[in-house]
Amino acid sequence: MGSSGDAWKLKDHPKLPKGKTVAVIVLDGWGEAKPNEFNAIHVAETPVMYSLKNGAPEKWRLIKAHGNAVGLPTEDDMGNSEVGHNALGAGRIFAQGAKLVDLALASGKIYEGEGFKYVKECFEKGTLHLIGLLSDGGVHSRLDQVQLLLKGAAKHGAKRIRVHALTDGRDVLDGSSVGFMETLENSLAQLREKGIDAQVASGGGRMYVTMDRYENDWDVVKRGWDAQVLGEAPHKFKDPVEAVKKLRQEPNANDQYLAPFVIVDDNGKPVAAILDGDAVVTFNFRADRMVMLAKALEYENFDKFDRVRVPKIRYAGMLQYHGELQLPSHYLVSPPEIARHSGEYLVRNGVRTFACSETVKFGHVTFFWNGNRSGYFNEKLEEYVEIPSDSGITFNVKPKMKALEIAERTRDAILSGKFDQVRVNLPNGDMVGHTGDIKATIEACKSADEAVKMILEAIEQVGGIYLVTADHGNAEDMVKRNKKGEPALDKNGNIQILTSHTCEPVPIAIGGPGLAPGVRFRQDLPTGGLANVAATFMNLHGSEAPSDYEPSLIEVVDN
């Protein structure tokens, strides 16, 4: 479809009026699961969300937020905020990073592209460094993809390979880092048997080393830079498996916050720093927690921390992590092309839009919502507000986060009369849920519920409409379960806390004084998912969705 005015024009909905203020509220990490002591949402007794579920059954339902419904390879793949907001904003299902990488590796096309050819130029004399999350969680990376990339790089000429492995414990169980490191070591040993000099060079926990996002805490990236590029870290080991085991024994240590370490040879020297003439590939397929490192690796004018030494390298991402910034400028697999998303359609049809969250999720209601695109479509019709997140802490310390501030700014935007749509992300359930602190997550859910209340009260005052949903599950089930669905126990008989997302469905609710009589959720879309939400809120704005969008979840029944 072209970009002329007529091509972007949305048809009027035959039964629903225009002119109502619509609030689209995304509760991050808020799925639906059986009520029990490990369901932080249930224990929190969230009265607003409870009333939406039980007050009008025809205006509340569950939708899918994982697997194929959000473009991921299998139904075992849990959703995440990136793909969730892509689907919410795009109104269609696009193959996402993990699936694109799978296809490129399976076909071998990854080795035929410009990105791989670019880094391959260093294979003869330099070292290939692979940096990323060592995990099978499938949210940011997958270990099997790394193993295939190692084999493929060796086959295509890499003679010296170093892996800088970040431990997970967030999308997978805490403590799983040891097994992942052992698996990686076995793969590297197989390469060594074939004459390839392949070793782990450094490591550290993802939330303490390298993988910050939205410029929340550059010290995280600096710790990674020091270990990976400079070969400097407070802990030195000869063996990476031993490194992880020993560092996990430190007080309050866990996989997410493992201290940075480097691997050294018999003389105590790092087995590899990143030097002039080397190649670097960041193998995460998810963008948000690679952008800051990509800037440090690629930008000549960089002032976020003292890099000390900036090697002349050839760098490529697994995908391009930021389309507007063209960052990185080289990448192995092209990211999904998402055009004609709902945000641009609404703006081109005169819908004045307000988007708000705090730093840790601000990019989700803007960049990811808008199809991996930064900036405004029309500054005269849009306003994006970022509330600075707390930095330097784990979010269970302050589980309320900035929910109140987000709600206040959104309330003010609604009452100002300047906007036709407000969309917000309330991060509490997800960000605090990732800490594994159930008590704090309960408080987080209460705070998010209170924020929803404030926004809905504003919608009530202006005679508007609300749509409340979530991007994926997390806080609703915070324990690992066995095949019988019972809480799983570790070797010491302790319950294994779950810090990852889930594959549970998420709620969606509609209502408000501006909702036309007879509007209800359809019964003929039992497998509806996040991609159906865009057409739904387009209808609430009084417009039909584009014909290729996933169908709206609502219908209007004449009374």
From Swiss-Prot:
Keywords: Cytoplasm, Glycolysis, Isomerase, Manganese, Metal-binding. The lineage of its organism: Eukaryota, Viridiplantae, Streptophyta, Embryophyta, Tracheophyta. It comes from Nicotiana tabacum (Common tobacco). The keyword Cytoplasm applies. It comes from the Eukaryota. One of its GO terms (molecular function) is manganese ion binding. One of its GO terms (cellular component) is cytoplasm. Transmembrane segments: none annotated. InterPro entries: Alkaline_phosphatase_core_sf, BPG-indep_PGM_N, Metalloenzyme, PGAM_B_sf, Pgm_bpd_ind. PANTHER family: 2,3-BISPHOSPHOGLYCERATE-INDEPENDENT PHOSPHOGLYCERATE MUTASE, 2,3-BISPHOSPHOGLYCERATE-INDEPENDENT PHOSPHOGLYCERATE MUTASE 1. It catalyses: (2R)-2-phosphoglycerate = (2R)-3-phosphoglycerate. Pathway: Carbohydrate degradation; glycolysis; pyruvate from D-glyceraldehyde 3-phosphate: step 3/5. This is 2,3-bisphosphoglycerate-independent phosphoglycerate mutase. One of its GO terms (biological process) is carbohydrate metabolic process. The active site is at S81 (phosphoserine intermediate).
